[in-house]
Amino acid sequence: MQKYREQITQIAQDIGFNDISFIDAKPLLKSEQHFIEWRQKGFAADMNYLLKENPINARPQELLKEAKTIIMLTANYYSPCPPRPSLEHGRIAAYATGLDYHKVLRKKIQELINHPSLEGIFKNSKFFTDAVPLLEKSFAKEAGLGFRGKNTLLLSKETGSFNFIAEILTDLELALDPLSSKAVGLEGCNGLRVEPFSPSAIEPPQGHCGKCTRCIDICPTNALPNPYQLDARKCISYQTIENREEIPQELHQGIGEWLFGCDLCQTICPYNRKHGDEGI
């Protein structure tokens, strides 16, 4: 299986995924509890797919009973935002400026699992990208592909937070990556050295961002009431994408020119401001 793992890694990188990790398909019970507590505070707003009592969230075997390994993948989508023609033009989130990422990533994963050199080993597998209520950020963090930032997004020292997350659940027993192996020895946003993230720690992990609060400070609707905590009811992305009702009057000024989504808590992050190459 080690041979296949090396082949999978090389193929994934060749077709555009910037990071890949193999982890045990075990339930993330601490992440599940953290999610339940977040939901109980009303922070999920009226997103019904998050409000349901759903065991899928942190339990891979609910999606694939025979799952033994999860192959976690990330694909960077950073692209310099073109200047608006005038102040009368609105703004949209970076991920929405290109093709439908669900279709793009599904095509790439199909190219990966159907690659001739893999000899059809993915016969009993399922793959997803933001299509089921799986705690993708938690599994990606568990796989060592990054750490949870104060804006609640998955942050990678190499590629920042402008990353799509995808996963392949399989019955293959592939060699597993040491947990958090890719998240050790990072520096905080303010340059301070911080302790490596321990995947066994109760979420949310404290660290890596140091004393930096730029993402919290820049949010015009105060959607980040505390570090590592998002109140979707006040989030511009929720209000302009998910909300099917009238946007509350008190949020109008903060939303401003945003028409679809928002990137403020990402573009202000020092981990994103250093990137110059366009992503997938």
Predicted regions and their residues:
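Auxiliary alpha/beta "docking" domains used to position bulky ligands
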Residues: 1-182, 205-206, 247, 256-257
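A short, charged helix-loop
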Residues: 171-174, 202, 234-243
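Residue-level hotspots at or immediately adjacent to binding/recognition sites across diverse folds
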Residues: 210
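Iron-sulfur cluster-binding cysteine motifs and their immediate structural context
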Residues: 214-237, 244, 255-280
